[in-house]
């Protein structure tokens, strides 16, 4: 774990089994994550291109997380930016985005995408994201109902 400027939080890129369980608990706090199982969360973390966590430096408890799927050159898509409810309002979502977007492996990526609720636009705009108006629209093929 790397300290964040002597703050009580540390960056995590490799997650212990205990932290994977804590990640599952964090996912369960989200409106979209209630049906996701521990095993599914474990698979998701293992197969993401880049995962960033924030942990309480004293206890090691995982309190924030985000991830990206990317080819590390043309495109990246950020998913699952989340901070434990007990730690929200301390700027940790921004620390997650800063750490992910400025990660050495992300420096050659041409465009970084994310999807969010419109109420979150002002938050993400502070990190340079904008509503993407293009000639194309995202399409989805549902192969199973989202958990």
Walk through the language-model features, giving the residues of each.
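A conserved beta-strand-loop-helix scaffold within acyl/acetyltransferase catalytic domains
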Residues: 40-58, 62-82
């Amino acid at each position: 774990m790397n300290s964040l400027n002597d703050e009580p939080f540390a960056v995590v890129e490799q997650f212990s089994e205990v932290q994977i369980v804590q990640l599952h608990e964090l996912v369960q706090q989200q409106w979209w994550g209630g049906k996701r199982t521990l095993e599914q969360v474990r698979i998701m973390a293992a197969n993401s291109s880049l995962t960033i966590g924030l942990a309480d430096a004293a206890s090691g408890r995982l309190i924030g997380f985000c991830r990206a799927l990317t080819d590390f050159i043309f495109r990246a898509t950020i998913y699952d930016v989340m901070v434990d409810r007990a730690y929200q309002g301390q700027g940790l979502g921004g620390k997650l985005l800063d750490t992910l977007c400025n990660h050495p492996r992300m420096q050659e990526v041409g465009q970084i995408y994310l999807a969010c609720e419109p109420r979150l636009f002002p938050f993400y705009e502070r990190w340079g994201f904008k509503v993407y108006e293009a000639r194309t629209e995202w399409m989805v093929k549902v192969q199973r109902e989202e958990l």
